[in-house]
From Swiss-Prot:
Disulfide bonds join 5-20, 9-22, 15-28. This is a cyclic peptide. This is Cyclotide psybry C. Keywords: Disulfide bond, Knottin, Plant defense. It holds the Pfam family Cyclotide. Belongs to the cyclotide family. One of its GO terms (biological process) is defense response. The keyword Disulfide bond applies. There is a cross-link at residues 1-31 (Cyclopeptide (Gly-Asn)).
Length: 31
């Protein structure tokens, strides 16, 4: 399935998908 949080966030520490947050591993996950 499609993961709306599939982006990484090591560059600017932000996730552009709604309802997603940057994890410690610099991967966007659902919050």
């Amino acid at each position: 399935g499609f993961n709306p949080c599939g982006e990484t966030c090591q560059i600017d520490q932000t996730c552009h998908a709604p309802g997603c947050t940057c994890s410690i591993a610099n991967i966007c996950v659902r919050n």
